[in-house]
Amino acid sequence: MSKVRERIYLTKDELKDIEIDILNRRHIERYAMIRQWLWGNVIDVSCGCGYGTHLVSNNPDITGIIGIDISEEAIEWANSNFITDKCLFLKQKIEDFDIKADVLISIETIEHLKDPHILNELAERTQVSEMFISYPSKKTTHYNKHHYRDFIDDEIIRIFTNFKLVDVIDLHREVRILKLQRYVSSI
Protein backbone atom coordinates (compact mmCIF):
# COMPACT_ATOMS: atom_id res chain seq x y z
CA MET A 1 0.00 0.00 0.00
CA SER A 2 1.40 3.38 -0.94
CA LYS A 3 1.95 5.96 1.72
CA VAL A 4 0.23 9.34 1.29
CA ARG A 5 2.67 12.25 1.26
CA GLU A 6 1.39 14.77 3.76
CA ARG A 7 4.53 16.88 3.81
CA ILE A 8 6.95 18.00 1.19
CA TYR A 9 10.50 18.25 2.47
CA LEU A 10 12.42 20.80 0.44
CA THR A 11 15.51 22.88 0.93
CA LYS A 12 15.43 26.64 0.30
CA ASP A 13 17.35 26.09 -2.92
CA GLU A 14 14.94 23.42 -4.13
CA LEU A 15 12.00 25.67 -3.35
CA LYS A 16 13.61 28.56 -5.24
CA ASP A 17 14.22 26.30 -8.25
CA ILE A 18 10.57 25.21 -8.24
CA GLU A 19 9.39 28.83 -8.06
CA ILE A 20 11.60 29.78 -11.02
CA ASP A 21 10.26 26.79 -12.95
CA ILE A 22 6.67 27.89 -12.28
CA LEU A 23 7.41 31.44 -13.48
CA ASN A 24 9.10 30.12 -16.64
CA ARG A 25 6.19 27.81 -17.37
CA ARG A 26 3.70 30.65 -16.93
CA HIS A 27 5.58 32.82 -19.42
CA ILE A 28 5.57 29.98 -21.93
CA GLU A 29 1.89 29.32 -21.20
CA ARG A 30 0.95 32.81 -22.43
CA TYR A 31 2.27 32.01 -25.88
CA ALA A 32 0.81 28.50 -25.83
CA MET A 33 -2.59 29.96 -24.95
CA ILE A 34 -2.77 32.40 -27.87
CA ARG A 35 -1.12 30.39 -30.62
CA GLN A 36 -4.38 28.65 -31.53
CA TRP A 37 -5.84 31.99 -32.71
CA LEU A 38 -2.84 33.19 -34.72
CA TRP A 39 -2.77 33.12 -38.50
CA GLY A 40 -0.95 34.56 -41.51
CA ASN A 41 2.06 36.76 -40.91
CA VAL A 42 2.66 37.58 -37.26
CA ILE A 43 4.80 40.14 -35.43
CA ASP A 44 6.02 39.30 -31.92
CA VAL A 45 6.89 42.61 -30.27
CA SER A 46 9.67 42.46 -27.68
CA CYS A 47 10.21 38.77 -28.38
CA GLY A 48 13.11 38.49 -25.97
CA CYS A 49 15.10 35.29 -26.47
CA GLY A 50 12.65 33.88 -29.02
CA TYR A 51 11.13 30.88 -27.25
CA GLY A 52 7.57 32.24 -27.53
CA THR A 53 8.00 33.22 -31.15
CA HIS A 54 9.21 29.72 -31.94
CA LEU A 55 6.42 28.11 -29.92
CA VAL A 56 3.63 29.92 -31.76
CA SER A 57 5.29 29.33 -35.14
CA ASN A 58 4.32 25.66 -34.78
CA ASN A 59 0.71 26.66 -35.53
CA PRO A 60 0.15 25.55 -39.17
CA ASP A 61 -2.07 28.61 -39.76
CA ILE A 62 0.95 30.88 -39.35
CA THR A 63 2.71 31.68 -42.61
CA GLY A 64 5.64 33.39 -40.92
CA ILE A 65 6.54 35.23 -37.75
CA ILE A 66 9.02 38.00 -37.07
CA GLY A 67 10.21 38.55 -33.53
CA ILE A 68 11.63 41.98 -32.80
CA ASP A 69 13.54 43.14 -29.74
CA ILE A 70 16.00 45.92 -28.91
CA SER A 71 18.38 43.59 -27.07
CA GLU A 72 21.21 42.45 -29.29
CA GLU A 73 22.03 39.64 -26.85
CA ALA A 74 18.43 38.35 -26.87
CA ILE A 75 18.22 38.42 -30.68
CA GLU A 76 21.57 36.62 -31.00
CA TRP A 77 20.23 33.92 -28.65
CA ALA A 78 16.98 33.67 -30.62
CA ASN A 79 18.85 33.37 -33.92
CA SER A 80 21.15 30.70 -32.44
CA ASN A 81 18.39 28.61 -30.89
CA PHE A 82 14.99 29.24 -32.48
CA ILE A 83 15.33 30.33 -36.09
CA THR A 84 13.34 28.24 -38.58
CA ASP A 85 11.98 28.69 -42.08
CA LYS A 86 8.94 30.38 -40.44
CA CYS A 87 10.78 32.38 -37.73
CA LEU A 88 12.89 35.48 -38.27
CA PHE A 89 14.39 37.56 -35.47
CA LEU A 90 15.44 41.19 -35.84
CA LYS A 91 17.14 43.64 -33.50
CA GLN A 92 14.85 46.58 -34.03
CA LYS A 93 13.01 49.32 -32.19
CA ILE A 94 9.22 49.24 -32.23
CA GLU A 95 9.25 52.75 -33.71
CA ASP A 96 11.29 51.63 -36.74
CA PHE A 97 9.49 48.42 -37.68
CA ASP A 98 7.22 48.69 -40.75
CA ILE A 99 6.77 45.25 -42.36
CA LYS A 100 3.10 44.50 -43.06
CA ALA A 101 1.49 41.67 -41.08
CA ASP A 102 -1.86 40.14 -40.15
CA VAL A 103 -1.53 39.75 -36.38
CA LEU A 104 0.55 41.48 -33.72
CA ILE A 105 1.34 39.87 -30.39
CA SER A 106 2.73 41.77 -27.43
CA ILE A 107 3.28 39.55 -24.42
CA GLU A 108 4.11 41.57 -21.30
CA THR A 109 5.51 44.54 -23.22
CA ILE A 110 3.13 47.45 -22.79
CA GLU A 111 3.97 48.05 -19.13
CA HIS A 112 7.67 48.38 -20.09
CA LEU A 113 7.06 51.22 -22.54
CA LYS A 114 7.48 54.88 -21.58
CA ASP A 115 4.92 55.67 -24.27
CA PRO A 116 2.53 52.75 -24.83
CA HIS A 117 1.01 54.56 -27.83
CA ILE A 118 3.98 53.38 -29.93
CA LEU A 119 2.24 49.98 -30.05
CA ASN A 120 -0.80 51.62 -31.66
CA GLU A 121 1.47 53.40 -34.15
CA LEU A 122 3.10 50.05 -34.95
CA ALA A 123 -0.32 48.44 -35.47
CA GLU A 124 -1.24 51.20 -37.93
CA ARG A 125 2.10 51.09 -39.82
CA THR A 126 1.98 47.32 -40.19
CA GLN A 127 -1.77 47.27 -40.93
CA VAL A 128 -2.49 44.30 -38.66
CA SER A 129 -6.07 43.05 -38.38
CA GLU A 130 -5.77 41.53 -34.91
CA MET A 131 -3.67 41.93 -31.79
CA PHE A 132 -3.07 40.01 -28.60
CA ILE A 133 -1.84 42.27 -25.80
CA SER A 134 -0.97 40.79 -22.41
CA TYR A 135 -0.15 42.67 -19.25
CA PRO A 136 -0.01 42.10 -15.48
CA SER A 137 -3.49 42.51 -14.03
CA LYS A 138 -2.15 43.45 -10.63
CA LYS A 139 0.00 46.30 -9.37
CA THR A 140 3.64 45.65 -10.25
CA THR A 141 5.32 49.05 -10.48
CA HIS A 142 6.16 49.11 -6.77
CA TYR A 143 8.45 46.07 -7.07
CA ASN A 144 9.45 45.88 -10.74
CA LYS A 145 11.67 48.81 -11.71
CA HIS A 146 11.24 47.93 -15.43
CA HIS A 147 7.49 48.60 -15.36
CA TYR A 148 6.54 52.21 -16.06
CA ARG A 149 2.86 51.87 -15.19
CA ASP A 150 0.05 49.54 -14.23
CA PHE A 151 -2.93 49.10 -16.56
CA ILE A 152 -6.55 48.12 -16.58
CA ASP A 153 -8.36 46.84 -19.69
CA ASP A 154 -10.06 50.15 -20.54
CA GLU A 155 -6.77 52.05 -20.55
CA ILE A 156 -5.27 49.63 -23.04
CA ILE A 157 -8.36 49.59 -25.25
CA ARG A 158 -8.27 53.41 -25.44
CA ILE A 159 -4.67 53.29 -26.72
CA PHE A 160 -5.70 51.27 -29.78
CA THR A 161 -8.10 53.71 -31.44
CA ASN A 162 -8.99 51.60 -34.50
CA PHE A 163 -9.50 48.33 -32.61
CA LYS A 164 -12.26 46.79 -30.53
CA LEU A 165 -12.05 44.31 -27.69
CA VAL A 166 -13.36 40.87 -28.72
CA ASP A 167 -12.07 38.58 -25.98
CA VAL A 168 -10.28 38.53 -22.63
CA ILE A 169 -8.23 35.66 -21.23
CA ASP A 170 -7.45 35.78 -17.51
CA LEU A 171 -4.45 33.64 -16.53
CA HIS A 172 -4.01 32.76 -12.87
CA ARG A 173 -5.59 36.08 -11.86
CA GLU A 174 -2.26 37.75 -12.52
CA VAL A 175 -2.08 38.27 -16.28
CA ARG A 176 -4.73 39.33 -18.76
CA ILE A 177 -4.57 38.80 -22.51
CA LEU A 178 -6.76 41.08 -24.60
CA LYS A 179 -7.74 40.05 -28.11
CA LEU A 180 -8.39 43.13 -30.23
CA GLN A 181 -9.69 43.32 -33.80
CA ARG A 182 -9.52 46.23 -36.19
CA TYR A 183 -12.82 47.99 -36.83
CA VAL A 184 -13.96 47.23 -40.38
CA SER A 185 -15.16 50.21 -42.38
CA SER A 186 -18.54 49.77 -44.07
CA ILE A 187 -17.59 52.11 -46.91
Predicted segments, located by residue:
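Conserved N-terminal segment of class I S-adenosyl-L-methionine
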Residues: 1-97, 107, 117-121, 143-164, ...
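A short helix->loop->beta-strand "cap" motif at the edges of active sites that frequently abuts
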Residues: 62-63, 127-129
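Short, Asp-centered acidic motifs that coordinate Mg2+ and/or phosphate
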Residues: 103
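Residues lining the SAM
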Residues: 107-110, 134
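Helix-to-beta-strand junctions that scaffold the AdoMet/dcAdoMet cofactor pocket
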Residues: 113-114, 126-128
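Conserved beta-strand signature within the Rossmann-like core of class I S-adenosyl-L-methionine
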Residues: 128-136
